[in-house]
Amino acid sequence: MTYCVALRLDKGLLFMSDTRTNAGVDNISTFRKMFTWSVEGDRVITIMTAGNLATTQAVISLLDERSVIPADRKQTLLAAPTMFQVARLVGDTLKEVIHSQAAEGQTAESTFGATIIVGGQIRGMEPRLFLVYPEGNFIEASDETPFFQAGETKYGRPIILRAFDPAMSFEDAIKLLFVSFDSTLKANLAVGMPLDLHAYRIDTFETGIQRRVPSDDPYFHAISSDWGRALKEAIDKLPDFSV
């Protein structure tokens, strides 16, 4: 299982993903689910993947290969003219991989499903954020929906819905995502550390902050402990129910 979140902030884009994959309680591995491509001064693009590991690895490999040796120079992550075209390229590649794997196997296409979050900025345009579905179609983040999640979303979603503000700083947004991930980690063993973090600041066209947060990270554990304590204190302060 996977948990990925991307926030569209006034100051840029923030991405976070876990790294755990599992095929049962006795077969747990760590795989990167966040990938970044950049051309300094021109573009930064980040992709996060959730779903069938073979599918997502094939998609990332194809996108990489076609960026190096493009059949159509405009149809690569490093040359697409807009982020919309980037999202369409990712969707087409995902659909291609799913159809190819289904044709070679004996099971339904849904077995090979995956969902992808793609965001970034190309010079001359605003940062954009998309959620790509297994069918290859996609939606874009907006003022009404300024964040996307993929994978095991239900445990960490209420925290983001209550506290997220696009005007918040990167520091506060990272704290918010740490709380969201902490809630998910405690509720679902299929989501696990380390976490990958990428903060892209608007109009810099540089990769920005990229960090792996290990399971023994002291700041993450401080956030987890302080959040748990603050939640208990908040519950104590709520009015009592009359019985």
Enumerate the predicted regions with their spans.
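N-terminal nucleophile
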Residues: M1-V243
